Amino acid sequence: MLALRVLLKGKILIGGRVREREVLAEDGWIVKIGKRLNEEADLTLELGKRELAVPAPIDLHVHCRDPHPDYPFGFKTETRRFLLGGVATVVDMPNTRPAPTTPETYYEKEELARENAEIEVIVAGGVRDSQCTKELVEAGAYVLGEVFLATSTDAPAVPWSTLPEIFRELSPDGPLTIFHPELDELVAERPARNLYEHLKNRPPEAETTAVGLLAGLKVRYPSRIHLSHVTLPESVKIAKGADITVDVTPHHLFFDVLRVDPEDPVFKVNPPLRGRHHRLGLLRAVRRGDVDVLASDHAPHILEDEFEDVPSGVTGGEIILPAALTLHRRFGLSLRDAVAMITCRPAKLLGRDDLGEVAVGKRARITVVRMREFVVRAEEFGEEDRKFPYDGMRMFGEPVKLIDGTKVYDLKESRREGKPVILEGE
């Protein structure tokens, strides 16, 4: 049953500050906010003492693998997992088969997402060359990329020599274009038997050189480009100097090659986990406010035994909200900035002024979290047999409810049942 009028009462993060308020949503939009509204509703949620309502997260970088003939995953399976973690909006990357590199394949993928996704999926158009970039811009794609500058899983590299022509099709008021900043010429294609060998194959200079070259192109061709999953504080510094936005992943902030078993294939990912000093430098950049967004780079793979045989990529879109709140609780990031990294900042980059805040006139997408530590369990998200590095990890801020328009989900019950459980209105 749809709850056309939802009334939320309790502690709510509004404008970056925690306030005792009531929020009324009607037909999927926030229509009133006040200390006491005296309004009737189809469903009223009164928050508990340790519960806090925040804008529902936006994950700027996921791979749902749909369409793709070789994966048993897709929009249905992956967006259900995101929903179980309280996420309401994701941007899906284009390394699929077929890739959305023409208006036709782009529209087909959008339709596939509309038919199967449990939450909103923003489809990113695939960049192959300047012609397809031009066609996708004309077709209305407002996100392009991830543009791979080095070969990765299911993603051939876009030759560096073609980038100036691609940049000519971009503009300061054009689509957000997301880049994977590793340079193919500096990446080795040798087999790797452990994380150390994988790291050696994809060294830091492959990233910093790519970032520097992209910064030069940005100066020459003004555009809205964004660097995803950067792993080095030097990369952040170069990007900031060129007014380029960046995101980092939870796995690059929480793990390094010294904190995990180097032969564990779960942690094989591109770009690779770095050393401890790189990870701590990246955390310092986050605390300084130099990193714009926290994004998961959710990339599902079935877990295999042999390190060499395992594709690169990990899942984690389900825990993007607890990851942000853990940065607040344990690493000194303010609550305002921690939540902004997964809400209003990605919304601004996407040009979506209907998302990212609890405010009148915004979409009613709000997640309720219990502000306490909890243990992440892979089985609660259907991640038992996949590359999920967060199993057993203690995090802060357990998602317990999700308001997504006219639907209100009980997330704890949903995780228990393994499917969305909608709260009934009166």
From Swiss-Prot:
GO terms for cellular component: cytoplasm. Transmembrane segments: none annotated. It is an enzyme of class 3 (hydrolase). Pathway: Pyrimidine metabolism; UMP biosynthesis via de novo pathway; (S)-dihydroorotate from bicarbonate: step 3/3. It catalyses: (S)-dihydroorotate + H2O = N-carbamoyl-L-aspartate + H(+). Zn(2+) 1 binds at H61, H63, E146, D297. Binds 2 Zn(2+) ions per subunit. The keyword Zinc applies. GO terms for biological process: 'de novo' UMP biosynthetic process; purine nucleobase catabolic process. The keyword Zinc applies. GO terms for molecular function: allantoinase activity; dihydroorotase activity; zinc ion binding. The active site is at D297. It comes from the Archaea. Zn(2+) 2 binds at E146, H180, H229. Substrate binds at H63, C64, R65, N95, H301. Its cofactor is Zn(2+). InterPro entries: Amidohydro-rel, DHOase, DHOase/Allantoinase_Hydrolase, Metal-dep_hydrolase_composite, Metal_Hydrolase. Its EC number is 3.5.2.3. Keywords: Hydrolase, Metal-binding, Pyrimidine biosynthesis, Zinc. Catalyzes the reversible cyclization of carbamoyl aspartate to dihydroorotate. Belongs to the metallo-dependent hydrolases superfamily. DHOase family. Class I DHOase subfamily. This is Dihydroorotase.
